[in-house]
Amino acid sequence: MQKLTILLLVAAVLMSTQALIKGGGEKRPKEKIKFLSKRKTTAESWWEGECSGWSVYCTQHSECCSGECTGNYCELF
């Protein structure tokens, strides 16, 4: 029974190693991290002046950090 368990574990390790080699290995997680790190939080966008805060004059939704331009003023949420 122990030999069968060890054999199954070795087979699982070999199969997972082969899948990593064929799938590109560590490239995919790095690409995912780069994609996620490009996004800025609302606070970062506001701090860098890329969007307007609450109750500031606006003409488009994209100008507001909240994404809501109602009645020419940025909404809070």
UniProtKB/Swiss-Prot annotation:
GO cellular component: extracellular region
Predominant subcellular localization, coarse grouping: secreted
Residue span(s) of the pro-peptide: 20-37
SS bond partners: C51-C65, C58-C69, C64-C74
Keywords of this entry: Cleavage on pair of basic residues, Disulfide bond, Knottin, Neurotoxin, Secreted, Signal, Toxin
A molecular function (GO) term: toxin activity
Subcellular location: Secreted
Tissue/organ expression: Expressed by the venom duct.
Signal peptide, first to last residue: 1-19
Domain notes for this protein: The presence of a 'disulfide through disulfide knot' structurally defines this protein as a knottin.
Family according to the record: Belongs to the conotoxin O2 superfamily.
Entry protein name: Conotoxin VnMEKL-0223
Species name: Conus ventricosus
Lineage, broadest ranks: Eukaryota, Metazoa, Spiralia, Lophotrochozoa, Mollusca
